[in-house]
Amino acid sequence: MADRLIVKGAREHNLRSVDLDLPRDSLIVFTGLSGSGKSSLAFDTIFAEGQRRYVESLSAYARQFLGQMDKPDVDFIEGLSPAVSIDQKSTNRNPRSTVGTITEVYDYLRLLYARAGTPHCPICGEQISRQTPQQIVDQVLVLPEGTRFLVLAPVVRTRKGEFADLFDKLNAQGYSRVRVDDVVYPLSDPPKLKKQEKHDIEVVVDRLTVKIAAKQRLTDSVETALNLADGIVVLEFPDDHDERGHPREQCFSEKLACPNGHPLAVDDLEPRSFSFNSPYGACPECVGLGIRKEIDSDLVVPDPDRTLAEGAVAPWSAGRTAEYFTRMMAGLGEKLGFDVDTPWRKLPAKARKAILEGSDHQVHVQYHNRYGRPRSYYVDFEGVLTFLQRKMEQTESEQMKERYEGFMRNIPCPVCQGTRLKPEILAVTLAAGERGAKSIAEVCELSIADCSAFLNALILGVREQAIAGQVLKEIQSRLGFLLDVGLEYLSLSRAAATLSGGEAQRIRLATQIGSGLVGVLYVLDEPSIGLHQRDNRRLIETLTRLRALGNTLIVVEHDEDTIAHADWVVDIGPGAGEHGGQIVHNGTYRELLANKDSITGAYLSGRESIATPTRRRSVDRKRELTVVGAREHNLRGIDVSFPLGVLTSVTGVSGSGKSTLVNDILAAVLANRLNGARQVPGRHTRVTGLEHLDKLVRVDQSPIGRTPRSNPATYTGVFDKIRILFAATTEAKVRGYQPGRFSFNVKGGRCEACTGDGTIKIEMNFLPDVYVPCEVCQGARYNRETLEVHYKGKAISEVLDMSIEEAAEFFEPIIGINRYLRTLVDVGLGYVRLGQPAPTLSGGEAQRVKLASELQKRSTGRTIYILDEPTTGLHFDDIRKLLNVINGLVDKDNTVIVIEHNLDVIKTSDWIVDMGPEGGAQGGTVVAEGTPEDVAAVPESYTGKFLAEVVGAGCAPARTPRRRRTVTA
């Protein structure tokens, strides 16, 4: 049927021969517990088959250049359209990619500036233009009649040389005079120039007086000068002097030229001239990157409260040379009047400058040799900054280079100030009335909302309007789509590598809407990630607009509002992993609310909920972590305190500065001080309260491994203990097997036919590569001899094939192993197989594996945990389990800080730091802080407005739209 999408017998991963009938041209939401099979059905089955069919429709020649996709394990799919996947995994890490380039807005801006921009001289700011010989003559003839002037052809501009050959050549061509460095000489007796000095040479083509009768002679002279000087002619007016007493000059050019005669290197403006990825436009200093690495004194002296003897100067505080450098600084102290036991911040400015930049004087270094005899010598004191720069240039060791780079920070290029473009390109502007004239770099620095407003206000002439009208329409269309998905706070110059997964996904979503495709199947992975509740409405409107074009949308989502606005909802479950893979509900949202078998329906209808705590943990304001003077990115020099021993949620709209504050500054400082890392923190003054902590644990949703060889058992370390246990069996001891025998990563115990993979890859040339079970080990990964060793009747491969829940029961008597496995069960991963390959784990599952790995370590009560949107990919019931784990950590007096938008997590927090009020330049401040009840009472807080609806109540049912599309079952 043309209006249906029918799936029969889907068995990918944990799917249990699923049959599904979906309406086309609809917004369909797939929901269910984490690991229930949503992504397996949406991405690995429906999208994979749609993509595969499209690729196979191409010629064999074309297919060899495209990534082939495996045929999913499904009987058949009917009514399938060409499929486009919009996920969160393909964030661009290229330093040259920006929001402007990946949305193609920058391409249109380049075209706009090339065709309608007004060029100026980058030196004096005067407008520059090109003119024909006729236009030049017409401008001269409007001068008062009788005005005397010389027609000069500048053949040399600020170049070194004697130029004797040039003078001879000009003399032979019939020219009689030449002006050299503002002095006129006859070519019959030219000056002898100094070879090592720069000179200006102009040929005197003619002497004329302004009068109509001389028009033809003037035209001939101007054309001669233009031909002689490569398109430039200079007129000197001997009777009219400037403020310095020099004769006034006027420069004309067939090319772009400064009217004040400043030398320019501007060719005809083309779109490539505005590209920082092209040599025609890129700043020559930074080759279009906009940044360069430079040693930062704040990183060299990270803790100004330390003394020099205590290691205040970080590069000189570690290793065997620390004592040598301390003695050297003591010698400098004798000369400048300070001692090494004074804290850095209390040292005189002159002393700090000398330590950093070096001293002109030799310093007297005194020490005792190994026999206790006093010794001394004199040495030049080069300064720590010079020392680091020299070492950086000299070393060939990657390890040492990495160490020195730890004291360097990316700073804007000093030539282009981070704009990436040449000065002459930055001098091309477009004017927008009261908003002023802006270069392409200045427009890209604006937020998308301000950029749209600026382009709307452009003042263009009739000619420019005719040229730029269509280009502006394309730009505004794309900017409008970015605004619709809640990205108004981003700038077009924002580096793609700094975007979160949610931001990158919404940019791709906006790009797809701009493409205007019809009849496409879009598969999206949680587009609401990283989006504040305030912006959800615009995202939903964007999705419905994409559907209205005539497309089918399948959205894997847990957000209540998105589910409530769906035309059709598929709930997959009932549990996760082996307990999931079935269709629990396939119908409308209202039918889902009434479905007694659906745990999703139970939470959405209010039958189940995550309760608001009846009492919150008390906050001790004397025990807190404080970031002072945070000013990285859009943070406005703010001071923020995080109470210790409680659960703190950092909230705020997208782009308000949450990740910058917590990840770029706080977590980086903690990692350096507590874990011995060498990260470069964002700009701030200091962080206080570190003495209350002894360890940092960061948990995000990045994969636990990139290859199938990584799995929950190897990541948590429990596999090492299992291998030791197998090596301790009687059979293993008889055979002399060590724990390494039971590893599938090294020779000895693994199957060498498949090198421990369990599968063999068969290349099929024009067809996708086929993976088949290894014929030797039948997918077990180990050789026959290793598999003959059993523990309680199970071989090592059979243990890896157990679910974690089964394994916990199997190893119950072995406390060291059971403790690891019980922790994985506690975070809701009992359904996952112990040896399940890491690439098959969802983001939520990977995060919980990491959390479990940390949980099984013994707690000191002085650990701080930082989690970045831990609810990503988690169902309501998964969130409940996660909160139980987090609260267990806090109950042991540890500190947990989460960056979060989910109201269930926020309402159960003990403390909230709400950033805002808006995103981008309008953000970067603390709007509210306190308990959830305190924040809910702050009218300026967007988070507070939504929090007020749920604080003190259970999980309220999602608001349903007033009007809904009718979908036939």
Curated annotation (Swiss-Prot):
Binding annotation for ATP: 32-39, 652-659
Superkingdom per UniProt: Bacteria
Zinc fingers typed C4-type, residue spans: 258-286, 751-777
Keyword Nucleotidyltransferase listed: no
Cited Pfam families: UvrA_DNA-bind, UvrA_inter
Protein's UniProt keywords contain DNA repair: yes
Family membership: Belongs to the ABC transporter superfamily. UvrA family.
Subunit (UniProt): Forms a heterotetramer with UvrB during the search for lesions.
Name of the protein: UvrABC system protein A
Organism placement in taxonomy: Bacteria, Bacillati, Actinomycetota, Actinomycetes, Mycobacteriales
